[in-house]
Amino acid sequence: MRMTFLSYLKQWRGTAKEAFENVSIVAKFLCLLHVTDRYIISTTHVHGPSMLPTLNLTGDVILAEHLSHRFGKIGLGDVVLVRSPRDPKRMVTKRILGLEGDRLTFSADPLVGDASVSVLVPKGHVWIQGDNLYASTDSRHFGPVPYSLIEGKALLRVWPPEYFGSLR
């Protein structure tokens, strides 16, 4: 009987070791996925009227990279993912129209009239706007956005397939 118990113990130990190794591999893979998604490249579903006609109202899936803004490689015209200054839990997709030191003149409210406002983008900030001026809450409403709120740069649209390609 003692031999049987020891043989079961050895068998259990081998099975437990194999299970632990498999769980370890899965955990490492999940960590790699998280790091890739958070710090390198990810897909993001974006929707709403603010980026019409560049992005669809009903939604697009875009591929966004998360390295450029960390190395100061964001430029005028880039479409970026930004944490909303009004609600940091929310992400917004906008186009960069001004970098630090730029002076911009824009229509205060395009629905009301031609009154224009001029602003200087301060150091460490960018000016973002939606492509649809009539349906976008952007820097015209909350001012220049700190560079630290930029989460990524949109590379291309991957869904729907008929619109696959660059966002320029």
Curated annotation (Swiss-Prot):
Main localisation: mitochondrion
Cited Pfam families: Peptidase_S26
Record's keyword annotation contains Hydrolase: yes
Membrane keyword on record: yes
Major enzyme class: hydrolase
Keywords: Hydrolase, Membrane, Mitochondrion, Mitochondrion inner membrane, Transit peptide
Chain segment of the transit peptide: 1-47
Compartment list: Mitochondrion inner membrane
GO cellular component: mitochondrial inner membrane; mitochondrion
SUPFAM superfamilies named in the record: LexA/Signal peptidase (SSF51306)
Any GO molecular function: serine-type endopeptidase activity
InterPro entries: LexA/Signal_pep-like_sf, Mito_IMP1_subunit, Pept_S26A_signal_pept_1, Pept_S26A_signal_pept_1_CS, Peptidase_S26
Record: active site: 50, 94
Knockout consequences: No visible phenotype.
GO terms under biological process: signal peptide processing
E.C. number(s) listed in UniProt: 3.4.21.-
Family the UniProt entry places it in: Belongs to the peptidase S26 family. IMP1 subfamily.
Description of how the protein assembles with itself and partners: Heterodimer of 2 subunits, IMP1A/B and IMP12.
Functional note: Catalyzes the removal of transit peptides required for the targeting of proteins from the mitochondrial matrix, across the inner membrane, into the inter-membrane space.
NCBIfam families: sigpep_I_bact (TIGR02227)
Name this polypeptide is given: Mitochondrial ATP-independent inner membrane protease subunit 1a
Organism, as annotated: Arabidopsis thaliana (Mouse-ear cress)
Lineage summary: Eukaryota, Viridiplantae, Streptophyta, Embryophyta, Tracheophyta
